[in-house]
């Protein structure tokens, strides 16, 4: 493939960001693509092209309606909405494409018509203008082969609703010019999308999963109703296949794409005739269900799981996509609760093999694995790893959760470090976050709510969550945290345990645990006071009142060693820091310390939220006791125990409940 790094932003693109974009096709997904681009790049000039004035008028009205709704919901200011609607026009004239640096076709799945469209586009745009198609199934080699400059063209497959769904497949085909795919990945990542690179196979990666999932559901109609199938399918997805087909008017799509796959790869992919004759399916809405006989439910469950396994191993065996992108794409783009590989891992290789064996017996011709199923499961799902000048750059990638930590993620980070910390070719490590919004938005609550009220189990939970951090404390090779965006809670605690911190200028830090009625249990009450004693008053405010700290302020205080303008510069600076720190010993953090006495405060957060007096008292006691501890290990243990104590308070129950219910906590009734 033409891509250089797993993290799209490690190296700066050689092309500028788009300034003038045209989208051909104003009737369906095209306007949504346009709204996403204008929301991310308000200064962009956007042209919507269509053959029907009515479609253009409706698209412009939809665009304005999206902006109006965003303002009404508090997602956008009036000024931002005005910028999103500025420099947006519609046209019937292809001559208006002149001067565009990117043209996206989202008009048709007819190959001949696509080729005619791109011939018309090439006649009007500069030779270096980028040209892409939003096709969900047609290979780039077929679409662009007749172009004069095919090297500037590829497929960028968006998912509905394109203004909100972050996933986009970027097709790395042999005709793509050097740097094209990487540039598009960079553009998408900078504008909030999740680019997933695939090869130029028919239907690419995610449509292979979704279309065959739906076609298999259609094959089950000989024994079950659409409602029964959707009910069982919700083991895997938030909305069943027939509900989604109704929503997307997707029956013709299944006919089209599975016919293409059948013609290309075999009759076992032929679409079920029922998709040609049914307009809408009778099926329950998400969150509701119908009764299904247990035996029938088992049959449906095995068939649906079987097609997921079959398609997944085929995608990986043929190199159509990566295992990490497959799982993440299924969750983010298609609404699966777990990716196929994640489901297989949780189910166990033996049970997955049973399901697959049954599926292949019932569906001869469908893909079978070339390796033992267990071999497909040995992959990282939440981090990306790149090698930059002898430094391992670890990128936290859970964009749907702002890169929040999970047990799996910390285990994967630790695994990368353990594998390479004794490798002489590796100088050290950089830890950064995916995208531009977040380094890490804290730790997922995970199973913590089940531990409320259990002091010892909660303290042990904090110890378990600290395995990676304690390992970082003892490392000889340097680890540098590169803050590409916000660092909250456990994410900031992770960064604090790295040898050095660097940040982009607009990054910021916060310890919001007190607003949940709990304490930060994995080092925040201990480490910052020992590493940066001059900033003790700042940490007092961050811990007790959830005060924010900007990267610029952290730089002035010496917490952040340097600031960068953007992510590529940030990673380069972090790598340079690693190399400069290589061989140097870390400053020991043992010994009692004497921070300034904690000042009396009102129990009110920096944002005005009333806080729990009891939680603040527990935190203040822990900070004092930890400061007096003779070793770092003893100080950390005080923090673990204090976290356990906080888990037994009424404030913790209220704070965690409020978080889950998406409301403000009321600590007035808890103390």
Tell where the protein language model's regions lie, with residue ranges.
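N-terminal glycine-rich phosphate-binding loop for ADP-containing cofactors
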Residues: 1-389, 397-400, 408, 451-453, ...
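Glycine-rich beta-to-alpha active-site loop
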Residues: 33, 470-516
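Redox-cofactor binding/interface segments in oxidoreductases and associated redox assembly factors
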Residues: 104-105, 133, 432, 481, ...
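Conserved CoA-thioester-binding segment of acyl-CoA-metabolizing enzymes
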Residues: 373-436, 456, 460, 470
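Terminal peptide-recognition signature
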Residues: 394, 398, 412-413, 431, ...
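Glycine- (often His-adjacent) and acidic-residue-rich active-site loop
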Residues: 433-468, 487, 515-517
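Short helix- or helix-capping micro-motifs
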Residues: 441-443, 528, 538-546
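Acidic, divalent-metal-coordinating active-site segment for phosphoryl/phosphodiester hydrolysis
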Residues: 489, 546-553
């Amino acid at each position: 493939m033409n891509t250089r790094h797993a993290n799209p932003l490690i190296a700066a693109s050689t092309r500028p960001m788009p300034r003038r974009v045209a989208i051909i096709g104003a009737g369906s997904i095209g306007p949504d693509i346009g709204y996403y681009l204008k929301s991310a790049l308000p200064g962009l000039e956007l042209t919507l092209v269509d053959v029907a004035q009515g479609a253009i008028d409706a698209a412009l009205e939809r665009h304005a309606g999206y902006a109006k709704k965003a303002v009404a919901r508090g997602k956008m200011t009036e000024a931002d909405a005005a910028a999103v609607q500025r420099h947006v026009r519609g046209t019937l004239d292809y001559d208006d494409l002149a001067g565009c640096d990117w043209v996206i076709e989202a008009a048709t799945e007819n190959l001949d018509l696509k080729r005619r469209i791109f011939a018309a586009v090439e006649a009007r745009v500069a030779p270096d203008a980028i040209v892409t198609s939003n096709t969900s199934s047609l290979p780039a080699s077929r679409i662009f082969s007749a172009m004069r400059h095919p090297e500037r063209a590829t497929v960028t497959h968006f998912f509905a609703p394109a203004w909100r769904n972050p996933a986009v497949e970027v097709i790395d085909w042999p005709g793509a010019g050097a740097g094209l795919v990487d540039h598009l990945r960079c553009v998408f990542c900078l504008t909030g999308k999740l680019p997933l690179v695939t090869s130029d196979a028919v239907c690419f990666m995610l449509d292979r999963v979704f279309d065959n999932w739906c076609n298999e559901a259609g094959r089950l109609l000989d024994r079950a109703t659409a409602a029964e199938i959707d009910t069982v399918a919700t083991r895997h997805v938030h909305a069943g296949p027939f509900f989604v087909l109704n929503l997307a008017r997707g029956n013709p799509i299944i006919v089209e794409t599975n016919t293409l796959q059948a013609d290309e790869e075999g009759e076992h992919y032929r679409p079920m005739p029922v998709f040609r004759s049914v307009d809408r399916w009778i099926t329950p809405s998400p969150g509701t269900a119908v009764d299904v006989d247990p035996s029938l439910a088992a049959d449906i469950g095995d068939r649906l799981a079987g097609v997921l396994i079959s398609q997944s191993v085929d995608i990986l065996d043929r190199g159509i996509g990566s295992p990490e992108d497959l799982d993440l794409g299924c969750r983010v783009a298609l609404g699966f609760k777990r990716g196929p590989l994640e489901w297989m891992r949780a189910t166990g290789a033996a049970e997955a093999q049973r399901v697959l064996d049954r599926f292949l017996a019932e569906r001869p011709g469908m893909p079978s694995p070339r390796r033992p199923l267990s071999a497909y499961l040995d992959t990282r799902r939440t981090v990306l790893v790149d090698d930059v000048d002898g430094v391992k750059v670890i990128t936290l990638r859970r964009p749907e959760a702002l890169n929040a930590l999970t047990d799996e993620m910390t285990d994967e980070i630790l695994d990368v470090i353990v594998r390479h910390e004794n490798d002489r070719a590796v100088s050290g490590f950089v830890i950064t976050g995916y995208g531009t919004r977040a380094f890490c938005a804290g730790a997922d609550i995970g199973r913590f709510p089940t531990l409320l009220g259990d002091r010892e189990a909660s303290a042990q939970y904090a110890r378990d969550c600290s395995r990676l951090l304690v390992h970082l404390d003892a490392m000889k090779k340097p680890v540098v945290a590169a803050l590409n965006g916000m660092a909250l809670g456990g994410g900031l605690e992770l960064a604090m345990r790295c040898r050095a911190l660097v940040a982009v200028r607009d990054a910021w830090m916060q310890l919001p645990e007190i607003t949940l009625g709990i304490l930060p249990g994995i080092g925040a009450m201990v480490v910052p006071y020992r590493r940066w004693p001059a900033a003790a008053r700042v940490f007092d405010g961050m811990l007790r009142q959830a005060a924010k700290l900007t990267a610029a302020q952290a730089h002035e205080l010496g917490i952040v060693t340097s600031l960068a303008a953007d992510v590529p510069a940030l990673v380069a600076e972090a790598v340079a820091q690693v190399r400069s720190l290589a061989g140097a010993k870390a400053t020991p953090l043992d010994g009692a310390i004497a921070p300034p006495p904690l000042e009396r405060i009102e129990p009110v957060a920096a944002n005005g939220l009333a806080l729990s007096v009891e939680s603040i008292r527990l935190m203040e006691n822990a900070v004092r006791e930890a400061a007096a501890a003779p070793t770092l290990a003893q100080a950390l243990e005080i923090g673990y125990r204090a976290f356990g104590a906080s888990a037994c308070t009424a404030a913790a129950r209220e704070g965690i409940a409020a978080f889950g219910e998406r409301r403000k906590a009321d600590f007035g009734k808890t103390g």
